[in-house]
């Protein structure tokens, strides 16, 4: 029975690496996968899922207007699809997450979504919000803060390397713009810590 999976983490936890490995595992068994990535994420080229360790794969693009169920139903009728993998799933809309649940429930195709849970302000992305609510399986991929604790927050950095807490939710960037940290160091960087009482 197919399920909807949400693999989430802060940045640089190996989400794209895990996605590419999962796709390879299916393909190695002669199964067909379809890999998607967000149209707005062009850090490594358009229509490419790329990992920091050098793995990459061509990918179909989605944007806010893409009807994923319609596209996948058509693909599946043409040639059966064994697994759908979505990179940068935080950029999905509520309707697209609903459509992916229909791909699982009506077409019986497993859907594996990989993305960030929260933005640099600590707020959920739309796609992450609905995946946390509707996914059958939630899997946290872990990365490490500079202090050694689990990093579960993302800091956005300005051109001088200072943490910022204001601005557009989506600004595409890599290690020059974002760093994953633990909650304690997130609060320290943004000046959100409580003063110790004497």
UniProtKB/Swiss-Prot annotation:
GO cellular component: cytosol
Positions bound to Zn(2+): 145, 147, 182, 185
Enzyme class: transferase
This protein's record includes keyword tRNA-binding: no
Residues at which ATP binds: 9-16, 87-90
Keywords: ATP-binding, Cytoplasm, DNA synthesis, Kinase, Metal-binding, Nucleotide-binding, Transferase, Zinc
Descriptive protein name: Thymidine kinase
Organism: Pectobacterium atrosepticum (strain SCRI 1043 / ATCC BAA-672)
């Amino acid at each position: 029975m197919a399920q909807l999976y949400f693999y989430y983490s802060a940045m640089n936890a190996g989400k794209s690496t895990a996605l590419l490995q999962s796709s390879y595992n299916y393909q190695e068994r002669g199964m067909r996968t379809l890999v998607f990535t967000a149209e707005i994420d062009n850090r490594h080229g358009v229509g490419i899922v790329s990992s920091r360790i050098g793995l990459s794969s061509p990918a179909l693009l989605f944007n806010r207007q893409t009807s994923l169920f319609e596209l996948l139903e058509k693909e599946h009728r043409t040639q059966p699809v064994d697994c759908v993998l979505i990179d940068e799933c935080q950029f999905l809309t509520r309707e697209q997450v609903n459509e992916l649940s229909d791909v699982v429930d009506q077409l019986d195709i497993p859907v594996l979504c990989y993305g960030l849970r929260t933005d640099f302000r600590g707020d959920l992305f739309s796609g992450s919000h609905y995946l946390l609510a509707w996914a059958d399986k939630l899997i946290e991929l872990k990365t490490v803060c500079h202090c050694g604790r689990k990093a579960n927050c993302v800091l956005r950095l300005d051109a001088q390397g200072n943490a910022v807490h204001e601005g557009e939710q989506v600004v595409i960037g890599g290690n020059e713009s974002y760093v994953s940290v633990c909650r304690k160091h997130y609060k320290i960087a943004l000046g959100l810590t409580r003063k110790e009482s004497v």
